[in-house]
Amino acid sequence: GEKYDEFVDKFVRAARKHYPNAYIHFEDFGLNNARRILDKYTPEISCFNDDVQGTGCVTLAAIMAAFQVSGVKWEDARFVMFGSGTAGTGIADQIKDAISQRSGKSTEEAGQQIW
């Protein structure tokens, strides 16, 4: 709620004031807050949310290794996500960006390869 957002904002402002070059690692903010808070502060500070981005990075690395071994092309791959939690949506975002970057498709087109 509002008090939660005020607390996070107060912390981020204090961290920026005292440690202007700090990298902030957000952890366990939950589905309703993780993406929203990450999106709010990413343009302003160096930050990372393990729930959204960490699991996605590890999963993407595994997919990239599998594609290298198997020869599967990004534009030919299809992905099914089971669950819509913070990690699942983060994984889907990482995969969508990778498809777009590696195949030249728009992110909208890339998203059509993910269910």
Identify the residue ranges that each predicted region occupies.
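Metallocofactor- and cofactor-centric catalytic cores in central/energy metabolism, strongly enriched
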Residues: 1-75, 81, 86, 90, ...
